[in-house]
Amino acid sequence: MIAHEFPIHYIEPVFRPPSEAHSLILPVTNGCSWNRCGFCEMYTQPQKKFRARDEAEVLEEIRRCGERLIVKRVFLADGDALVLPTRRLLVVLEAIRRHLPEVERVSSSYCLPRNLRRKSVDELRELADAGLRMAYVGAESGDDEVLARVNKGETYASTLDALEKLGEAGISRSVMILNGLGGMTLSAQHADNSARLMNAAQPEYLSTLVVSFPTGEQRFRAGFADFEALDRRALFVEVERLLQGLELEDTVFRSDHASNYLVLKGELGADKARLLAEVRQAIEQPQHAALRQEWQRGL
């Protein structure tokens, strides 16, 4: 190995949440085990075909990182690290503890509820005890009609079950909702039922992202032919409706992903009134709101 090479081999593109900007990205899988969601283009390239990475290769990369890097946080990639058997995940987590003793938090990538539900609460507790502190879950919507239209392969009930399992196991949950996913026709029910799902789950973290199609809408419209995209104002109205419906006790809320026009940050429920006021200003007086321009959205 050339001395200046980074200790980890990546198959591009590699994705991470905004909050993992300073984490070591450690791929334990390549691609997504489902990869059928109509809205998602992240893992559609041929080189991102799903597979579990070789265990020995991953362990060697962890060892090399321990020799060269000081690491505080680790993010397990790619599309859904928790699809791996619990035994394999425990081996990886143990290696992180051994070779990267400064690590304070290990997070798992965009977990599919279907794969979380295959693990028992006891298995998830084992992972938590071994150092897994957070799981990112792309709920996308709490509305069954929207989920079916976009071929998510999940329902309100299946997503709630997965989130409750994680919570019972002591793993923090960071949940993503896709602003605009239901289009104009399903916008209201998308917002209402997403709020209902979050109220039932009470996740530790919640974020909204704007649905977007950098390479075109053909894949998406295969299952949602009458989709009518929300304009910027309608996106804000939908976020406002979502926030109005949320009854959260202690959840960190963020809309700081590159796709968002309006960046929102606060605690729910403490900051609910302030967040709603910021959204209302974006609706009524966009010229006075700190909105991102199209070129700033990085899509």
Indicate where each model-derived feature is located.
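Canonical Radical SAM [4Fe-4S] cluster-binding loop centered on the CxxxCxxC motif
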Residues: E12-E57
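Auxiliary Fe-S-binding modules of radical SAM enzymes
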Residues: M1-E20, R196-L299
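Catalytic cores of alpha/beta
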Residues: K119-E123, G182-A200
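Hydrophobic faces of well-ordered beta-strands that scaffold small-molecule active sites
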Residues: L24-L26, V74, R105-S109, A135-V137, ...
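Conserved, mostly hydrophobic/aromatic
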Residues: C32, C40, V58, L76, ...
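Conserved SAM/AdoMet-binding glycine-rich loop
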Residues: C65-E168, E247
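Conserved strand-turn element in the central/C-terminal portion of the radical SAM core barrel
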Residues: R114, G142-V146, L166-H190, L209-G216, ...
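A short acidic, helix-capping loop that chelates divalent metal ions and anchors anionic groups
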Residues: K48, D144-R149, E217-Q218, L262-L264
